């Protein structure tokens, strides 16, 4: 199986290796025109849960994982580049009317929309919100996007996801005085599952113009 932290394709270990399938998780991303018919498979993981899928031998490849990769020689990784995050709110949100950069104290008075860490065996991570801040926890970026558009809270989103909504005015980007606005993203894989299929997927991913656009070093 292959896991995307932000975008997913899958080739389950239980499937016929000669007939891998691909799932398009949303309209924001697709490596191929094929569709994965295994919607019951848990192919979407976030934060520590992404690396955990690799270290627990539940995935052969992960794409878009952030934070430090595992140090074991059983696994390899490649840096994809930086994932740019943008702090966004709906036009109806109170923070939309403030012209100056938003400081953490002010942001902390408003509900944060956050994605929960899918890790089961390791300590979960939290990013880009204050510990004392009220928050709504959602499953993935699609649900977070809907919550932000609905004005239920504020939060950071990858720029490549929200760019169309910023251009249309459905969401507004706000400057902040602090918070981690860029994440280093990785492609990781299990060395014990090395084979022709694994190498083919890695080459396909690393040579993808869309991947290079999403994760840049600018």
Predicted regions and their residues:
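C-terminal regulatory
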Residues: 74-152, 157, 161-180, 199, ...
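Short amphipathic alpha-helical segments
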Residues: 10-12, 132-134, 183-185
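Central regulatory/effector-binding core of bacterial HTH transcription factors
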Residues: 9-71
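Alpha-helical linker/hinge and terminal dimerization helices associated
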Residues: 1-13, 17-20, 201, 211-212
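Periplasmic-binding protein-like
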Residues: 178-191
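Hydrophobic residues within well-ordered alpha-helices
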Residues: 54-55, 147-152, 187
């Amino acid at each position: 199986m292959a896991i995307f932290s932000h975008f997913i394709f899958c080739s389950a270990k239980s499937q016929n290796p000669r007939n891998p399938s691909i799932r398009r998780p949303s309209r924001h991303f697709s490596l191929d025109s094929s569709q994965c018919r295994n919607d019951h498979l848990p192919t979407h993981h976030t934060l520590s849960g992404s690396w955990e899928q690799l270290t627990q031998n539940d995935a052969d490849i992960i794409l878009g994982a952030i934070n430090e990769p595992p140090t074991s020689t059983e696994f390899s990784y490649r840096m994809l580049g930086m994932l740019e995050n943008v702090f966004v709110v709906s036009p109806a949100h109170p923070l939309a009317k403030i012209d100056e950069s938003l400081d953490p104290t002010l942001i902390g008075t408003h509900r944060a929309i956050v994605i929960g860490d899918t890790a089961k065996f390791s300590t979960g991570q939290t990013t880009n919100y204050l510990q004392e801040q009220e928050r709504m926890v959602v499953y993935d970026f699609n649900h977070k996007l809907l919550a932000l558009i609905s004005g239920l809270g504020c939060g950071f989103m990858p720029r490549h996801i929200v760019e169309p909504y910023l251009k249309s005015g459905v969401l507004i980007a706000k400057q902040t005085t602090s918070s981690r606005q860029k994440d280093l993203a990785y492609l990781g894989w299990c060395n014990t599952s090395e084979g022709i299929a694994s190498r083919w997927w890695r080459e396909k991913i690393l040579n993808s113009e869309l991947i290079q656009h999403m994760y840049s070093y600018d």
